[in-house]
Amino acid sequence: MDPNMNNLLKWGIQNSTATQQTSDSNNNASQAPRSNITPEMLSALFGGPSEADLMKAAMEALRSDEVDLENKLIAFDNFEQLIESIDNANNLEPLGLWTPLVELLKHEEPDMRRMAAWCIGTAVQNNEKAQDKLIVMNAIPTLVSMSTQDPVPAVRKKAVYALSSAVRNYQPGTNELVKHLPGGYASGKVDAADMDTIDMIMDKLRAHPVSSSPPSAA
């Protein structure tokens, strides 16, 4: 991926959130990135990249063999911040970004799996449209497998976060979760609005014993 585009992604996120800071913080945050803008970045900015463009550029970086892990994680962080907006989260489908995002749950690099789960959790939180899409993508079984089998604690933690966001107050998601839980967990009908029961399931997933061997490919 073009390094200028990667810098542009960082600049775009920093400036898109600057208005939410206090006046002093805003001045400090805006001055630093602007001082680092290159002519190439300005040229790209004159084209007016939208947040949809930035989302697509981030995913391009995540899928590129030419981008190292450090810059992929920067792109992932930018992507996650962008989809905190429900409008951007709902744009994942028309932009064709759900499929590659879900595929990254099975990446060989733990940090990539962790960030993919984090982004999914952000996208589906209090968002029925995205929660429904996650079921269509058949991602809940993968997230259950990650939360109970992945050898890396940080990955498991984000997988549980994604599941928690996917099922709360969304009955189809809760039904799908219960269907794929290991033995010893809640079975039968679980009310998606029963936060105590949902919390118990999530707490049990967080405490699930995991072997040292890597998860089997789904």
UniProtKB/Swiss-Prot annotation:
Q: Where are the ARM repeats?
A: 26-67, 86-125, 128-168
Write down the species.
Emericella nidulans (strain FGSC A4 / ATCC 38163 / CBS 112.46 / NRRL 194 / M139) (Aspergillus nidulans)
Q: What is its main location?
A: cytoplasm
Q: What is this protein called?
A: Hsp70 nucleotide exchange factor fes1
Q: Which GO terms describe its biological process?
A: cytoplasm protein quality control by the ubiquitin-proteasome system; regulation of translation
Localization per Swiss-Prot or TrEMBL: Cytoplasm
Q: Which residue stretches, if any, does this entry annotate as coiled coil? A: none
InterPro entries of this UniProt entry?
A: ARM-like (IPR011989), ARM-type_fold (IPR016024), Hsp70_NEF-Inhibitors (IPR050693), Nucleotide_exch_fac_Fes1 (IPR013918)
Q: What GO cellular component is one of the record's annotations?
A: endoplasmic reticulum
